[in-house]
Amino acid sequence: MKLVKKQKENVTVILLESTLGLEENIKMLLAHEYTHWIREKEIKHDIFEMCIGERFITEGIACSFSEEIVPNKQTSYYTIVPNTTVEWVENNIETIDKVVETELDKNNMMYDFFYMFAKTRIPNMPVRTGYVYGYLKVKEYMRKNNLKIKDIVKLDWREVLNR
């Protein structure tokens, strides 16, 4: 899954071999990418690199919509990380909250939270935790406000993170 700029037009490239040809994996992946397409189209800024707050919520929305389309899987399935990463984020969410509190409107921690081979600043933090953190924040916001993805897909990230 990669967003590529081609002559001022965004093109999403989806590598279907990563789905192992399984219909539910394809549905999950397409649902995830669809929310990215809708969000970027409606918000009209770079949802991936503008700032870490935007990226958390963008990925959280995408993972949550995947869950709506392919229900009853573990969080690790939607966030595409090992179960141990999900557990680490759940056990350390307050630490993450404190670390990112003053960084949400910047993009200098993007690598720490979203890339496979990151050298993270939080001790023992697994890579790609941003997907889980965003997912948990989006799920919490939707639960508290009795909302669905369709209600928040265009919402400003600051609203979801109470900024």
Each PLM stretch: what is its role?
Residues 28-41, 59, 63:
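Active-site recognition of the HExxH zinc-binding catalytic motif
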Residues 50-87, 91:
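Post-HExxH zinc-binding segment in Zn-dependent metallohydrolases
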Residues 20-36, 86-108:
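An acidic intrinsically disordered interaction segment
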Residues 1-23:
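Active-site scaffold of zinc-dependent metalloenzymes
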Residues 95-163:
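Pan-zinc metallopeptidase signature
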